Amino acid sequence: MRIIHTADWHLGRILHNVSLLEDQQHMLEQLKVEIERDLPDALIIAGDIYDKAIPSEGAVRLLEGFINHVGGNLAVPIIMISGNHDSGPRLSFASTLLEKAKVHIIGKASVEVQPIILSDEHGEVYFYPVPYLSPIAARSLYQDSEILTHQDVIQRQVTRIIEQHPKDKRSVLIIHEFVIGGEISDSERQLSVGGTSHIEANIFSQFDYVAMGHLHQAQRAGYDHVRYSGSLLKYSFSEVKHNKGITKVTFDENGFVSSLHTPLKPTRDMRIVKGTLTEILEQAHLDTQREDFIRAELEDKEGLHEPMRRLKEMYPNALEIKHLRKTNQNAAQTETSFQELQKQDISELFAEFYQHICAEKLNEEQHKLVADVVEQLTNVSN
């Protein structure tokens, strides 16, 4: 059996007020080519199909067109689950009708995980789609107040699946979670705080393959058969070194054989350029990829006049500027001792913070409001 595993499309994503729909469409066109070439036995999309719970019209049309071509024209079975960015009920609209075309969209968790059974020349393979489920929602679903962490949720689901799974059949688990040790990036929405979102990879040991979603870097998660495919595109500058693409998985009669990461090429890459502004602008004349999304890390010692405007003259899709010298100076200034900070008035500290973030001072009315709030909080704490 041949499987293509992908995840974290985040259709409709907007980056610094720039729509990425055309970039996402370009990546999906490449994915279509890979599917047409390989004609896999299944396509897995492991959550975060959309970037928002209420997706844009353009994002919905993009997904619809993809499903029509792959599930309709190519007749390749699709198995899709919701992630933490998705609205399960919205994603699974018309899912009962789509199942007739072997397009399986599982947006809402249920007490019993129903397998999707596909076959190859060696027999049946059981696919277990597990949409994202928070501990709070799981406590309600299972009527169990002792479910406190994501580990508790997944352990409950996996245990039940293993109990019911035919022992002589191959199995694939599809899930959207964070496995301990995975490499994270800035663009992944935190599932919870305090480490309660962490899952141990050893609970997946009895499956032949685990198709993971959530982390944006393609990587193994504790075992070779437990993998993140990574996101469709780079969605933050913390991902500039990622090699985006899809994961192709091969099974034989005994189960998992291999996985292969197949890169996809974006129309506009995401890069960081570093140097003084003058150096960056001079080097830009030789740059053949000036349409890329750019963050400039400037090493200038002196202040600059309209650096973003000047940068955009050469890099029209420049998104960020980071002043490295200023950052280093700020880091030195933050060494003020905790004792010294305690001596300062909280209202004045907030005023300094506000001016730093908003580049303007608090007006008289705002000063009074902050002072009133601080006084109330101080009275409560005393």
What is each stretch, according to the model?
Residues 180, 185-255:
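Conserved beta-sheet core of the metallophosphoesterase superfamily
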Residues 16, 49-68, 82-101, 107, ...:
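Metal-dependent catalytic neighborhoods of phosphoester/phosphodiester hydrolases
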Residues 1-68, 75, 365-368, 372, ...:
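N-terminal active-site segment of His-dependent metallophosphoesterases
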Residues 37, 42, 251-382:
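Accessory, non-catalytic peripheral segments of nucleic-acid enzymes
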Residues 40-58, 77-89, 171, 177-195:
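Active-site neighborhood of divalent metal-dependent phosphoester/pyrophosphate hydrolases
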Residues 6-7, 43-48, 77-84, 104-109, ...:
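Active-site neighborhood of phospho(di)ester-bond hydrolases with catalytic His/Asp-centered motifs
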Residues 10-13, 51-53, 81-91, 111-113, ...:
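Active-site environment of divalent metal-dependent phosphoester hydrolases
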Residues 93-197:
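Conserved catalytic scaffold of divalent metal-dependent phosphoesterases
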